[in-house]
Amino acid sequence: MAMVRELELMTSWSNSMGRHRYPTRILVDSFGHKCSASDKGVWTSCSIRAPLQGRGSFRRGANIRFGSLPSSAAVATSGGGRGGGGVVVGGGGGDPWRRLDGSTASTELSLSPPPAQAAGGGGGGGGADALPWRHRPSPPSSAVATTSAAAAAALMAPMMLQPLDAGGGASAPPPPIRGIPIYNGPGGFPFLQPSPTAGDVGHHHHHHPKMGFYSSYHHPSTWPSTSPSPLAAPPGAASSPLDPTAAFLSSPHHRMLSAASGRLNGMLSVSDTLRSYGVPGAAAPGVIGGAHHHHHHLHGGQPFVGALASRFMPKLPAKRSMRAPRMRWTSTLHARFVHAVELLGGHERATPKSVLELMDVKDLTLAHVKSHLQMYRTVKSTDKPAASSGPADGGSGDEEFAGGGQAASGGGDSMCLRGGGGGGVAAAAFAEHGRSASEGAASSVGGGGGGDMDQSSAGNTSTTRWSNSSRDPWLSSNSCNMDAHRSVGLSSPIENLEPCRSSSSQVSNHELSSPSLEFTLGRPDWHGADHD
């Protein structure tokens, strides 16, 4: 019957942080399978190379003690070995393991099962002592039966598939290293939620299902560990069943496979997960895991959990910034805009914020005013006569003109520019830019009488649209007969404007005297509800 024993020796191992020598405890059964190793309370595989071949990279003449686990028989001491005062600690007084014999000892270990022989003497001397390791005689049959029964009870527990936990009960989680908590998952498999047992109820929050993937990347001393538990089982604690999955993961064959695959456990699960996220190169996870693992240990063992997660998570498309809603610059709204600009000292001195505050129109945003002012400056700085509308918002594309409350017809043959009552001195000045001062004064509406000027763009057969780009010239609709405006004074501006007014843009004198300043941001029922 195999018996699990504890071997304590000095180990020499190295990683990216350098070479280290630590006293290490190894749990070995009588068949030579190394179950786990412990280094100062942190589980690690160190550099105990291939215990199945019977070799270990421990220091020559190290202080090696052998003792059984708590599930075995009581610990007893016997006489010393030849020339070195060796101490043999065994279970039931008949331990088959023995200490190295001083400075002349060999580093070879014989991990074969102990023979079942009759009881013999203890102490050094004799021909059998010429070997550095020799098998002590087994205890009497009664002691063998007791020890074997205890070992059998310990080896039957792995069928329960429970992780090796410190003390077998609800223990405190391992202390964080440099302020970084250590995440431990049973079996070392990533993306597996551990079953809630009595041992991990107290620290269930440490077993995050996604953090099992990064459980062995928090400290250099845990590399390249594949063991499932963070603490060694103390000799005085109750026995904990050994997980056969943990024994397989800690075997040298599995460590060799893990090293070949970038030392990432469960690479098939990782590959499938990455492939589902659409990560390129997910079919070769060893390259990704190995490269990042090496990069992690070159930087002092600090965790790269966030960086690793960001590499595996899909890139979310950047959300477009919220833009102002679509709107139509009616002639009334534009007249109010021009009036505000003139009050601020002209288009060169006016700012979008000041114009917005001076206009005081509901639902008008700074983006609307800014783009409209930009186009207004563009028109004022050119020699072309300008149209009567401006851009709707900062980058929303083409917009329709809607002049004077009428819908822009399919031919786009009518656009209306109405001056606001009480201050419409600049309504026609915007449309009459480029003309002389006298002509502009003749065509402008003064005082509080209010005015209405319609420009019919004859020959413009397409729907009146324009682009927001400041490079595009404004559509000029100067085909309206302006001779009537030049030949008459300010006495009857409305009568002389009648020939230019289209049939769909009839407005009342009451509306001209007190125009409505309400406007909508592209509501489909705006024309039919209020302005039919």
UniProtKB/Swiss-Prot annotation:
GO terms for molecular function: transcription cis-regulatory region binding. The keyword Transcription regulation applies. Coiled coil: none annotated. Residues 453-471 have a biased composition (Low complexity). Residues 321-381 form the HTH myb-type domain. Disruption phenotype: Rolled inward leaves like a cylinder at mature stage. Narrow, extremely rolled and dark-green leaves. Malformed spikelets with low seed sets. Slight delay in heading date. Disordered and irregular arrangement of chloroplast grana lamellae. Abnormal sclerenchymatous cell development in the abaxial cell layers, altered mesophyll cell distribution, increased amounts of chlorophyll, and enhanced photosynthesis. Altered seed morphology, and reduced root number and root length. This is Probable transcription factor RL9. It comes from Oryza sativa subsp. japonica (Rice). The gene is RL9.
